[in-house]
UniProtKB/Swiss-Prot annotation:
Protein name as catalogued: Minor capsid protein L2
Family per record: Belongs to the papillomaviridae L2 protein family.
InterPro entries: Late_L2
One Pfam family this sequence matches: Late_protein_L2
Cell compartment(s), UniProt: Virion; Host nucleus; Host early endosome; Host Golgi apparatus
Function description: Minor protein of the capsid that localizes along the inner surface of the virion, within the central cavities beneath the L1 pentamers. Plays a role in capsid stabilization through interaction with the major capsid protein L1. Once the virion enters the host cell, L2 escorts the genomic DNA into the nucleus by promoting escape from the endosomal compartments and traffic through the host Golgi network.
PTM summary: Highly phosphorylated.
Native source organism of the sequence: Human papillomavirus 45
Length: 463
């Protein structure tokens, strides 16, 4: 059986032994010599250093360090030397005896002035003299002027370089005239030139142009390119994108958020809306019309990757929200309110209505033929004197004659006759008194298949 010998306990280092045993005086002599550097080898080096210089070579009795720079192996790299700063001095602990007070005063004792000190007395002639007077003695002040009088003199110099401008005199009585420039006399000499004023406004015939159209010198500003291939198109359905867009990126919802500026955010992995993941910037909003809708758009910037230098790389996203559709224009088919071929009710006016047995109305047909159209106007007349057909006005400038069945009590009227207008005469508007209407030749467009009436509802426009 092999006996196991107890392991040898390692002795403490010389430095540790020196710290504990130096104060008590129980240190071995080899420990003291090694720590304090008083060994035989140290003494030989001290003696030899008197004649030769051995500094910086690292020659000593301690462990080999290879000098100040250390050992450098062949083909290798030197180790980095770390400078160790100075250690703090130890705190000296002062023992407190049993008779010392346990309360330490922080404020020094102040000097106390003893009460009851005598009042200092002032002697000599340099002090103030206090003179007491009785209540019956009046106070008299000597106000006699001195012999020497004070004289005040003033001197003024005139410098033309710093002279004040001419003073405007009080304006005279105003005048009543068409001239708005009333001169006011000024004192002094005038240093300016009087130029007679010219009138720019001139009288004309009234046909001169009074307005002009400026040239479009300002170039049109191009809008943001939101629908390019480099932008990802994302549609936002919630209405918070219009009022609080930051609530879709972060959970912080400020009370006052600017709506027309660029918003910046910190990159985060927890966002309320997944479409706004990695969004670090939302640019200013823009309103546009797209396919019949009003669209609210914002251009966003993502921060998908980060480089070592701290640069953020990511794509651009176009977030848009359709506010409301633009309704198409409602088309209403227009219909003529009156017929151009039957206007019998527009010409007959009955003054009074006689009994049915006393009158027998007869119908007279009057035909007026013009190129490309014909018109027949029936009129109703009576053989009695009380019923007379009077044509007020006509929608065409054509001659109108009375029939033989109309008999007036006094004499036979002679209606003014007008010669038929030549069809080749170019006439667009016919004027009768204070009213005008379009010429019937241009009521219809002959070259178009669809016939559209080219007149108003009643056929007349009051001037």
């Amino acid at each position: 059986m092999v006996s196991h010998r107890a392991a040898r306990r390692k002795r403490a280092s010389a430095t540790d032994l020196y710290r504990t045993c130096k104060q008590s005086g129980t240190c071995p002599p080899d420990v003291i010599n090694k720590v304090e550097g008083t060994t035989l080898a140290d003494k030989i080096l001290q003696w030899s250093s008197l004649g030769i210089f051995l500094g910086g070579l690292g020659i000593g009795t301690g462990s080999g360090s290879g000098g100040r720079t250390g050992y450098v192996p062949l083909g290798g790299r030197s180790n980095t030397v770390v400078d160790v700063g100075p250690t703090r001095p130890p705190v000296v602990i002062e023992p407190v005896g049993p008779t010392d007070p346990s309360i330490v005063t922080l404020v020094e004792d102040s000097s106390v002035v003893a009460s009851g000190a005598p009042v200092p007395t002032f002697t000599g002639t340099s002090g103030f003299e206090i003179t007491s007077s009785g209540t019956t003695t009046p106070a008299v002040l000597d106000i006699t002027p001195t012999v020497d009088s004070v004289s005040i003199s003033s001197t003024s110099f005139t410098n033309p370089a710093f002279s004040d401008p001419s003073i405007i005199e009080v304006p005279q009585t105003g005048e009543v005239s068409g001239n708005i420039f009333v001169g006011t006399p000024t004192s002094g000499s005038h240093g300016y030139e009087e130029i007679p004023l010219q009138t720019f406004a001139s009288s004309g015939s009234g046909t001169e142009p009074i307005s002009s159209t400026p040239l479009p010198t300002v170039r049109r500003v191009r809008g943001p390119r939101l629908y390019s291939r480099a932008n990802q198109q994302v549609r936002v359905s919630t209405s918070q994108f219009l009022t609080h867009p930051s609530s879709l990126v972060t959970f912080d919802n400020p009370a006052y958020e600017p709506l027309d500026t660029t918003l910046s955010f910190e990159p985060t992995s927890n966002v309320p809306d997944s479409d706004f993941m990695d969004i670090i910037r939302l640019h200013r909003p823009a309103l546009s019309s797209r396919r019949g809708t009003v669209r609210f758009s914002r251009l966003g910037q993502r921060a998908t990757m980060f480089t070592r230098s701290g640069k953020q790389i990511g794509g651009r996203v176009h977030f848009y929200h359709d506010i409301s559709p633009i309704a198409a224009t409602e088309e209403i088919e227009l219909q003529p309110l009156i017929s151009a071929t039957n206007d019998s009710d527009l010409f007959d006016v009955y003054a009074d209505f006689p009994p049915p047995a006393s009158t027998t109305p007869s119908t007279i047909h009057k035909s007026f033929t013009y190129p490309k159209y014909s018109l027949t106007m029936p009129s109703t007349a009576a053989s009695s004197y009380s019923n007379v057909t009077v044509p007020l006005t006509s929608a065409w400038d054509v001659p109108i004659y009375t029939g033989p069945d109309i008999i007036l009590p006094s004499h036979t009227p002679m209606w003014p006759s007008t010669s038929p207008t030549n069809a080749s005469t170019t006439t667009y508007i016919g004027i009768h008194g204070t009213q005008y209407y379009l010429w019937p030749w241009y009521y219809y467009f002959p070259k178009k298949r669809k016939r559209i009436p080219y007149f108003f509802a009643d056929g007349f426009v009051a001037a």
